[in-house]
């Protein structure tokens, strides 16, 4: 599935949109396209950021972040969302910090054997 949604580039963002881009910025300093699709209605980005952080980055979550990214990756596989899978498993791989282990985990997910 693909969609074409007008996105306001970061370089053109002002006011509330600029503020939301700053809030949605990743630790690497980028704003993911999944957030940028909200650029015409910044208040919807606010809700997306809040949901994302409550699921993956809330201080009360005791599961390791790498595991949460693996769960998000498996959810992406089940939803046939290559975009989300690419980003979540990239994060998981970085957090796992062992490419062979990450490859085994990915293979298990891809074969529906998590």
Regions picked out by a protein language model, each given a short descriptive name:
Residues 1-114:
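Hydrophobic alpha-helical segments
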């Amino acid at each position: 599935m693909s969609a074409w949604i007008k996105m306001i580039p970061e370089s053109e963002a002002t006011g509330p949109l600029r503020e939301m881009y700053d809030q949605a910025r990743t630790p690497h300093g980028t704003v993911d396209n999944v957030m940028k699709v909200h650029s015409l209605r910044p208040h919807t980005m606010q809700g997306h950021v809040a949901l994302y952080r409550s699921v993956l980055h809330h201080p009360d979550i005791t599961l390791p972040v790498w595991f949460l990214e693996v769960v998000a990756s498996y959810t992406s596989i089940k939803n046939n969302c290559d975009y989300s899978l690419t980003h979540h498993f990239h994060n998981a791989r970085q957090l796992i910090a062992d490419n062979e282990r990450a490859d085994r985990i990915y293979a298990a997910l891809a074969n529906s054997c998590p």
